[in-house]
Amino acid sequence: EIALNDRSIGIEIVNDFKCQNVGNLNANPDSIELECSFPSYPKNQIDLVLSLIKEILKRHPEIDPIDIVAHSDIAPNRKSDPGPNFPWEEFYNHGIGAWYDISDFNEQLNKLKKQLPSVLEVQCALSIYGYPVELTGVQDRQSQFAVRAFQLHFRPSNYTGLIDEETTAILYALNKKYRSELVDDKTSCKNNND
């Protein structure tokens, strides 16, 4: 039971969206330029999903907050659902899933105003949090898809897939809260990526 589908509970949320690539892959094959249309979720649908997940967590209290993820978090190069309109912060406020502390975010943001980390350091932080990203040191296509998936989940107001201060501050705040033991382990990026 090492495959994700063998050890997970999936909830398929129907909310049709459409994405199309508007970039020129011949001009810049390492860039993703997707234009997407994501409809809003009806309140009754969100209430039903909240209720369902609460029941699942009662039966499986061993599920960690960081293990409640989106399809796009697991397969960022292939999936975009549930999209930027899914209310992750609201779910966190109901005791479901992970979210960053605003004080940690502000602390990280102040540090990053002096200097943004390298692409490799951000890739490492994404890997520590659990995103499938190869450590290349280049803001390549696979990195942009991973960053975009992260942004769809934690910073849905702007999900370009490009590394910026706000995205990095959120990522670092989440790792501080949920993965501090791995952040302090200097071999965690290598081990997490093997």
Set out the residue ranges of the language-model regions:
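Short acidic, glycine/serine/threonine-rich helix-capping segments at coil-helix boundaries
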Residues: 112-185
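Surface-exposed patches in mature extracellular/periplasmic domains of secreted proteins
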Residues: 56-70, 135-138, 159-162
